[in-house]
């Protein structure tokens, strides 16, 4: 971008970009925009705030159909963002391909040490012509958290799934049954978040299921439908899904993220439990209006064991350091909201806020 525009045009574009309070409030981005020399890659990313031609010409998914050599994709579970792109890339490939989804970190060095023997077998087949049966193996392999089993199949997800809703209810409950009463009785939940420039505390709402009574397996992606009202033109909606054990220990299962101004859906691609957002423009929110926001729950594979609970947390920022984020590199989180925002989350008969998850179908025993 620095080469494509005059200094005067760059200055004008930077000033416009800094009108976004999220960008202006974050020191690293403010510095990059004002001193782009030697930070050209970051500068271009920050300046291209919505999807479009600049990203498409660099998008591996767009380029994937041109690849005609064998591809083996490996990704480990965690927050789910990179899993989603890896799976989409796998779908776009036309040649021989394999997808392995490994366990939750801590991971080994990359390439993953535990996969070395498999790599050697693939090299022997494709480079040396040794018929060792590697191509007879299933195309998709998924480590399922909780049960710690490996599930294989010909595609993603490797099992048939049924997307079923769990509804947000009063008293912070998640239930298969929707709330039967109106907002006059089921008053909304809510939270106020000050910018992280003035506080270190990230406000969090949570809802949880009753303890599971039998092993419950979920593999795939999902959706969260939130009926929300905010008092600003924009905010973030950040969900984190946890497997909580009877003793209180927790493991992150997956996440979902949506900037409120990017709430538009690609209606042609979106299906139940599988939403797509084009991210090609930002549409400010009308403060005080109740909107339905549909978040994409990133892919995961997990079995909730008897006695465990599914806990869903909602915030508009990611905690800079907690039991999970403390393990991540600096700035490995979404850009915090730079303005104070009050959020109301409606979950009543007229506003069925819910999370739609990929329950695997049980095959009847013969």
Language model region names:
Residues 1-66:
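Accessory cap/linker subdomain of secreted extracellular hydrolases
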Residues 85-88, 114, 118-122:
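Extracytoplasmic/secreted proteins, especially bacterial periplasmic and envelope-associated proteins
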